[in-house]
Curated annotation (Swiss-Prot):
UniProt-annotated binding residues for [4Fe-4S] cluster: 202, 205
Encoding gene (name): CFD1
Assembly mode: Heterotetramer of 2 NBP35 and 2 CFD1 chains.
Entry GO CC: cytosol
Keyword ATP-binding: yes
Protein name: Cytosolic Fe-S cluster assembly factor CFD1
UniProt record similarity statement: Belongs to the Mrp/NBP35 ATP-binding proteins family. NUBP2/CFD1 subfamily.
Cofactor annotation comment: Binds 4 [4Fe-4S] clusters per heterotetramer. Contains two stable clusters in the N-termini of NBP35 and two labile, bridging clusters between subunits of the NBP35-CFD1 heterotetramer.
Presence of keyword DNA repair: no
A molecular function GO annotation: 4 iron, 4 sulfur cluster binding
Binding site for ATP: 26-33
Length: 283
């Protein structure tokens, strides 16, 4: 980190993080946390050191996704120590979430904007991530206080950009447009659009059926001339993996590497990492 960057206010906690990626969506219920989880799992399986920061303060679901609901974070001299996700293959994976700080996982978080902003500032400045290749930030839906706060806190950290998540339906893409416009206003680079829930994979015959429409994400990317990253189907086996890691004490990282979704995400992220994604109008 240069002296100029320190002067501009780069948080000490971020100085050893090579890349920062946000996962955004203007619409709730599109599977954003699922995309965050699978992005982190895929990067970890590729051998990277990965951190995941959950700033969905009123709905912190990632501890459940990673099978870490009963874990706690601890305070050290440099800040909170994130919870490590167990793995016997690939790189390293750590998670920080407000869910670890609640006395009861069922407690509701009823905070006004200033308290949310203060919590996000603390997450950015007071977590001891150590040396990371990637920090993935999971955000709540919309363009609310959390988004404004994270944009302000990252203004000197130069994040690589945002992955925008939508589902195929027009009611979803209409709200996701607002998120794309938000990124443009705060100068977040858009790494691309993912169309999630694009088809349903039958657990019996593995046939993919379009239970919703298809192509909404591609049309959205084309309209804004931003990269289109690909389609992610609904695969019941991913839910089974989450439940299996909890019931059988197996690592989600190790379970995920043999799933069909890992193949899909691996291809998407290879294109992102290699800078080979194309805009929607180029495909």
């Amino acid at each position: 980190m240069s002296a100029e960057t320190e002067l501009l206010g780069m948080p000490e906690s971020l100085k050893d993080i090579k890349h920062i990626i946000l996962v955004l969506s203007g619409k709730g219920g599109v599977g954003k946390s699922s995309v965050t989880t699978q992005t982190a799992l895929t990067l970890c399986l590729k051998g990277y050191k990965v951190g995941v920061l959950d700033i969905d303060l009123t709905g912190p679901s990632l501890p459940r996704m990673f099978g870490l609901e009963n874990k706690q974070v601890y305070q050290a001299s440099k800040g909170w120590i994130p919870v490590s996700v167990p793995t016997t293959s690939g790189g390293e994976l750590k998670l920080m979430s407000l869910g670890f700080l609640l006395d009861d996982r069922g407690n509701s978080v009823v905070w006004r904007g200033p308290k949310k902003s203060a919590m996000i500032k603390q997450f950015i400045k007071d977590v001891d991530w150590g040396d990371l290749d990637y920090l993935i930030i999971d955000t709540p839906p919309g363009t609310s206080d959390e988004h404004i706060s994270i944009a302000e806190e990252l203004r000197w950290a130069a994040p690589d950009g945002a992955i925008i998540v939508t589902t195929p339906q027009g009611v979803a893409t209409a709200d996701v447009r607002k998120e794309i416009n938000f990124c443009k206003k705060v100068n977040f680079n858009i790494l691309g659009v993912i169309e999630n829930m694009s088809g349903f994979i039958c657990p019996h015959c593995a046939e993919c059926t379009d239970i919703f429409s298809r192509g909404g994400g591609f049309k959205l990317a084309s309209e804004y001339n931003v990269p289109y990253l690909g389609n992610i189907p609904i695969d019941p086996t991913f839910v089974e993996l989450i439940e299996k890691q909890t019931g059988f004490k197996e690592s989600l990282v190790d379970l995920y590497k043999d799933s069909g979704l890992y193949v899909i995400f691996s291809k998407i992220l290879d294109n992102v990492l290699n800078g080979e994604v194309k805009s929607g109008t180029d495909q």
